[in-house]
Amino acid sequence: DATGAFKKNWKRNQNRGNTLKVRDSDMVKIQEEVADVFREVFTKELTEGGYEIADEEGEDVLLVKPAIVDLDVAAPDIPSPGRTMTYAESAGEMTLNLELYDSLTNDKIAKATDRKRDRLDGRMEWRTKVSNRADARRMMSGWAKALRSALDEARASTTPAAD
């Protein structure tokens, strides 16, 4: 599963000037949501590409160690009494640190880092848990497609040519 870490001072910055305060438990829920979306998006993309998701080490098994860092949710949907609507120009941003290891030898095979920021189109939009999740899914989908493409390239370069 993807681990997650918020951008430095994220909670303090979110709570500055807001009557609705982000609690540690809210942060844990957001991290769990991010991990769930990551698992869902990457599993879908890789299985559609013909890759099997393994729970155990073995021959031809890669260990994938993902970490979402510098997570900056612009407008977290925090439970509150009454009806509260939060607006923001963007869902926020996050960085993926991804490492691939040989599952048997634990040798690092590849490492990648990429930062994604949600689009800014100058319009304020109502931000909800659903819209934040959809935007996270869209951002992570690009990463999943890039991983699948890299794995496809590696597989093609190591597959013996047919005679």
Where are these regions (language model features)?
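A structural "domain/chain start" motif
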Residues: 1-35, 125, 149-163
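Stable alpha-helical elements in mature extracytoplasmic
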Residues: 30, 34, 38, 42, ...
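Short, Lys/Arg-enriched charge-dense amphipathic segments
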Residues: 14, 71-88, 133-139, 149-153
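C-terminal/domain-edge helix-coil "capping" segments
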Residues: 48-50, 93-95, 104-163
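Generic short beta-strand segments
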Residues: 2-7, 67-72, 115
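Flexible, glycine- and charge-enriched loops at secondary-structure boundaries
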Residues: 28, 32, 87, 129, ...
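Surface-exposed short loop/turn segments
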Residues: 44, 48-107, 118-127
